[in-house]
Amino acid sequence: MRLDVVTIFGEYLQPLQLSLIGKAQAQGLLDVRVRDLREHTHDRHRTVDDTPYGGGAGLLMKPEPWGEALDAVLADPPEDADPRGPVLVVPSPVGEVFTQRAAVELAAEPWLVFACGRYEGIDARVVEHYRTRVRVREVSLGDYVLNGGEVAVLAITEAVARLLPGVIGNAASLTEESHAPEHDGLLEHPAYTKPASWRGLDVPAVLAGGNHAAVERWRRDEALRRTATRRPDVLARLDPERCDARDLAVLAELGWTPDGSGFRAGGDPVADSSDTNEP
């Protein structure tokens, strides 16, 4: 996979040289190219911003440097590029909320281009124009505002790159974590390691009992409980057809009942057992 990142703060992307993402680049699994937006300016001050039409606070990034920068990227495609071109990812507080499902979708692409806005964002005509040429996804990390898109690029890149074959040593671990499709997008169950007892807190006995079926059942139950109490919005989207009788019983205890293609909360919530010392 190739990633092109257009930014005015290339130093911000240096953490991509570390840890598993850095190793993936060294192994040829990932090709990250950071491009300086200011290289596409034509005044001695290398200006990339100006005041917004209609007034208002702050400055807006000009379309001309962005047009030249993105055109230069598109003119240099990788050999395995999709005939439709790259997916242009624009971090923005007005974009779709980035999820694990979005990470999976982007990980299937051979080429991503990131446009890192600053100040009050990028002139709206840039996204409008490139929607006619490539696939564009405006993406938000959540309901808050950052100073620029670089932090979002770091997060999205890590979420996407770790899904590429060979980046994570044990690929099975990708299916045993929060939001994994293989576990219906539920939050991950509580996890424990040695010692068995620490500061008066014991590992649940079922995990040390050697009964693998019981362990898997406990993990599923705890995933359901944790999701119900911490992310009810996720649980509401759980497909009842994916639930067995035990799942339905656990959810009923928590006040959740099937409702069409999802679940509906209709009772009093039960405390998250992972926050207690109970097995």
Swiss-Prot record:
Statement: the UniProt record of this protein carries the keyword NAD: no
CDD domains: TrmD-like (cd18080)
Gene3D superfamilies hit by this protein: 3.40.1280.10, tRNA(m1g37)methyltransferase, domain 2
UniProt-recorded name of the protein: tRNA (guanine-N(1)-)-methyltransferase
Alphabetized Pfam families for the sequence: tRNA_m1G_MT
Top EC class, one word: transferase
Alphabetical list of SUPFAM superfamilies matching this protein: alpha/beta knot
Function: Specifically methylates guanosine-37 in various tRNAs.
UniProt-listed NCBIfam families: PRK00026.1, trmD
Main location, first listed in the record: cytoplasm
Entry EC no(s): 2.1.1.228
Catalytic activity, as annotated: guanosine(37) in tRNA + S-adenosyl-L-methionine = N(1)-methylguanosine(37) in tRNA + S-adenosyl-L-homocysteine + H(+)
TM segment ranges: none
Example of a GO biological process term: tRNA N1-guanine methylation
Binding site for S-adenosyl-L-methionine: G117, L141, G142, D143, Y144, V145, L146
Compartments where found: Cytoplasm
Subunit structure: Homodimer.
InterPro entries in the cross-refs: Alpha/beta_knot_MTases, tRNA_m1G_MeTrfase_C_sf, tRNA_m1G_MeTrfase_TrmD, tRNA_m1G_MTases_N, tRNA_MeTrfase_TRMD/TRM10
GO molecular function, one term: tRNA (guanine(37)-N1)-methyltransferase activity
UniProt organism field: Kineococcus radiotolerans (strain ATCC BAA-149 / DSM 14245 / SRS30216)
Lipid metabolism among keywords: no
Region of interest (Disordered), ranges: 256-279
GO cellular component: cytosol
Similarity remark: Belongs to the RNA methyltransferase TrmD family.
Record keywords: Cytoplasm, Methyltransferase, S-adenosyl-L-methionine, Transferase, tRNA processing
